[in-house]
């Protein structure tokens, strides 16, 4: 038995999957890792261009995955709100997001301007303005923008994994 090398690999190895059909995983923390298990790595140019990687997991299974900026954006915007005197729990933030219209604007969570701490509300607004989208004005709209942008990023990653593996999730 070969042990998994880090926490995400351990979580993937422990997934309750009955072996019927295809299964994908999403490990979402500061970073998000989304992918599937394979018996052999995929080493194609397309896979490389899609920024998909092969990691050896438990029992020599391949964790074929994409790294995505995850809840870092939520953690950072929460810190920015706190600095401005607005203290929100994560539940509060979810409720604020639920009050806003859906699909008003999207960001690329992996865009370089979001990698550094500080000024996240302004960075999101500037991104939306620069890309000709509705600019989020409220805390809830900013939060919803992040959550929906992550969801779209995950959807796109699953599509890339499907295109590279042929697996349907």
Predicted regions span which residues?
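Active-site core segments that coordinate phosphate-bearing ligands/cofactors
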Residues: 2-169
């Amino acid at each position: 038995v070969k042990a998994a090398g880090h926490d995400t690999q351990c979580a993937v190895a422990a997934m309750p999957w009955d072996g019927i059909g295809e299964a994908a995983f999403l490990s979402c923390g500061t970073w998000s890792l989304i992918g599937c298990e394979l018996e052999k790595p995929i080493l194609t140019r397309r896979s490389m261009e899609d920024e998909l990687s092969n990691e050896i997991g438990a029992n020599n299974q391949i964790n074929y995955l994409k790294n995505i900026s995850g809840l870092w954006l939520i953690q950072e915007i929460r810190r920015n709100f706190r600095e401005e005197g607005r203290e929100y729990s994560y539940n509060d933030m979810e409720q604020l997001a639920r009050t806003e219209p859906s699909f008003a604007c999207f960001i690329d969570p992996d865009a370089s301007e979001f990698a550094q701490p500080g000024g996240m509300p302004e960075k999101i607004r500037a991104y939306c303005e620069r890309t000709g989208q509705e600019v989020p004005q409220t805390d809830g709209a900013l939060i919803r923008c992040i959550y929906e942008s992550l969801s779209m990023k995950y959807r796109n990653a699953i599509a890339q994994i499907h295109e590279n593996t042929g697996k349907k999730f």
